[in-house]
């Protein structure tokens, strides 16, 4: 007697085990930079506060996130056809941020999503609500707040400065622009 089998996924276990695929604890920083660039941003701005409780805020002036569900859907990037064809995004970059922080709040395009990491890992429903008007600067379309990240300020700035070296858009850390000596626009003008 024969039988058949099909590939299947144990979704909760997959989500929890994904943290082991992000072996570098600073990967989420370059992933968030890449998302800002893909969204058409002209800058990505990082602000870090070790005191309250190791909080990192990431802001950009790109197109924003049209559907916040895409942030928490594995293998669904939400990028338009042009980005999909040119860069083949995996739809997993934001998951690296999920594993980097204890709590995350996202403000984008007038909407707000706020959750604890464990809520997301347990696949509990997370409310999307209207974002308060004063929740972000006027030059920002997306603001991501990461609370309780397990990095020091020195580790964060080192990773951001390394990633910024050849990055296509301006990168700021705590109000100061990071050097981009290998960025295309700098190479063309030097």
Please tell me what each predicted stretch does:
Residues 2-7, 37, 124-190:
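N-terminal assembly/transducer modules of large multi-domain enzymes
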Residues 49-56:
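Short beta-strand-loop-beta element adjacent to the nucleotide/active-site pocket used for signaling
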Residues 23-28, 66, 92, 151-155:
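Charged, alpha-helix-enriched surfaces in structured cytosolic catalytic cores
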Residues 42-49:
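A conserved short beta-strand within the histidine kinase catalytic ATPase domain
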Residues 1-41, 68-73:
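Bergerat-fold GHKL ATPase/HATPase_c domain
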Residues 60:
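Acidic ATP/Mg2+-coordinating residue in the GHKL
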Residues 63-126:
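Flexible ATP-lid and adjacent glycine-rich G1/G2 motifs of the Bergerat
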Residues 43, 55, 103-105, 112, ...:
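Structural motif
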């Amino acid at each position: 007697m024969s039988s058949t089998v099909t590939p299947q996924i144990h979704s909760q276990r997959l989500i929890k085990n994904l943290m082991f695929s992000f072996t570098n604890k600073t990967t989420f920083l370059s992933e968030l930079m890449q998302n800002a660039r893909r969204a058409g941003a002209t800058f990505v701005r990082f602000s870090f506060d070790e005191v309250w409780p190791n909080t990192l805020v990431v802001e950009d002036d790109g197109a924003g996130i049209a559907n916040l569900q895409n942030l928490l859907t594995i293998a669904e990037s939400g990028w338009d056809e042009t980005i999909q064809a040119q860069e083949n995004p995996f739809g997993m970059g934001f998951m690296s941020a999920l594993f980097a922080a204890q709590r995350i709040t996202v403000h984008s395009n007038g909407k707000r999503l706020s959750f604890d990491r464990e809520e997301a890992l347990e696949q509990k429903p997370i409310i999307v609500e209207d974002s308060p008007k004063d929740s972000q600067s006027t030059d920002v379309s997306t603001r991501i707040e990461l609370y309780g990240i397990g990095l020091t300020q020195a580790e964060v700035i080192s990773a951001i400065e390394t990633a910024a070296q050849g990055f296509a858009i301006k990168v700021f850390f705590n109000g100061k622009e990071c050097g981009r000596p290998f960025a295309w626009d700098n190479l063309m003008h030097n």
